[in-house]
């Protein structure tokens, strides 16, 4: 009897942990904080100590409600270090109310209106001969490629970003942490 009960408990645990036979890796921590698949992009981003500049910019741009929405969204999320690498004074200037339109343009160049995991990006790039062009919510065109097993993103200004943490699943999409702010044509 005890053996049958143990088997039943083991089976129930196995099914709940593998979602009917398909197992998923746990979300990686980002900025020292756990990321919950049941929370939306904003609910998770505010917990990352590496994304305080991004969160402040999203708030200043009035994009919180959008990124809390249903989605799905893929967000290429630049770190604080990525913003700090911009020319001196750029972030402070962009956060001024009179520069909101430019801030919105830059931030929405980091958002794709679809859920694209890194495996999807790899497959699309391979199918397109090595580089896949994607349109962002902000009207930018990003060139996605894979180099040495890492997803690379070329922005319209010619800058290159590397995905440093991929596939952070959200309730409304996915975040890929990047090491460079993606810029539109200026």
Regions of interest found by a model, annotated:
Residues 23-186:
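Mature, structured domains of secreted/extracytosolic soluble proteins
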Residues 1-10:
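Bacterial N-terminal signal peptides that target proteins for export
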Residues 15-24:
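C-terminal segment of classical bacterial N-terminal signal peptides
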């Amino acid at each position: 009897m005890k053996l049958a009960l143990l088997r039943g408990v083991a089976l129930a645990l196995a099914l709940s942990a593998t979602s009917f036979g398909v197992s998923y890796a746990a979300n990686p921590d980002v900025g020292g904080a756990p990321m919950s698949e049941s929370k939306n992009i904003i609910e998770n981003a505010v917990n990352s100590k590496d994304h305080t500049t991004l969160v402040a910019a999203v708030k200043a741009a009035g994009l919180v409600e959008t990124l809390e929405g249903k989605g799905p969204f893929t967000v290429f999320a630049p770190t604080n270090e990525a913003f700090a690498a911009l020319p001196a004074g750029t972030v402070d200037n962009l956060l001024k109310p009179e520069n909101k339109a430019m801030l919105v343009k830059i931030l929405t160049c980091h958002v794709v209106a679809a859920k694209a995991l890194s495996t999807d990006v790899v497959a699309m790039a391979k199918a397109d001969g090595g580089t896949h062009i994607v349109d962002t919510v902000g009207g930018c065109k990003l060139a996605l490629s894979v180099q040495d097993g890492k997803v690379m993103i070329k922005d319209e200004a010619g800058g290159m970003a590397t995905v440093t943490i991929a596939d952070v699943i959200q309730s409304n999409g996915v975040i890929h942490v990047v090491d460079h702010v993606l810029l539109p044509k200026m």
